[in-house]
Amino acid sequence: MPIEDVEKFTYLSKKYCVPIVIYYINNFYFKNFNSTSTITETTYYRLIAPNILRVKNINKCIYFDTDMLCLNDISIFNEFDIRDKIAFVVKDYGFMIKKNENYWKILGLKSNQYFNAGFLIINIEKYIKNNIAEKAIELLKKHSYPHMDQDVLNI
C-alpha cells in the first residue's frame, strides 16, 4: 500500500477518533485466479477477511466495496440480530435484469435469490463454521465464473 494511502487512513482515524487497522494480506491464494482490469486479485480478499478478523475476536463484519458511498451513520447495522444467519445480503435486482433473469439457473442455484457481494454483514463464527471461504476458493480453483467471487458466494 502506498505511503500516501496509509497517511490518509491515519488522518481519517484522527479526525473521526476511530481506530483504523491495516492488514497486509499475502495474495498467494489468489495469484492464479481470474482477474480483469477492474477486478483484481484483491477482490478475493473479502473471502478470507472473516478468518482474519476472527483471530481478533471480532464476531461481525460489515463489508462494503470501495465503490460504495455511505450517506448516513452505518452503526444501525450493529443492531441487526445475525446470530442465526451466515450473512445479511442485498438482492442484486439490477444485475438480474441487465444480465439475464435466469442467470441463477446457469449457476445451479435453487432460486433467483442472487445477491450483490459488494455489501455484506457477516456472522464471522457461522461463516467460518460453514467453511465459506474454503468452499469459495475451491470453486474458483475448479471453474471460471463471469462474476468471480460474487458468483461463488452466491453458490
Identify the role of each PLM range.
Residues 6-7, 73-74, 99, 131:
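Short glycine-/acidic-enriched loop or helix-start segments at secondary-structure transitions
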Residues 22-28, 44-97, 114, 121:
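GT-A fold catalytic core of metal-dependent nucleotide-sugar glycosyltransferases
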Residues 1:
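Short beta-strand/loop segment that forms part of the nucleotide-sugar
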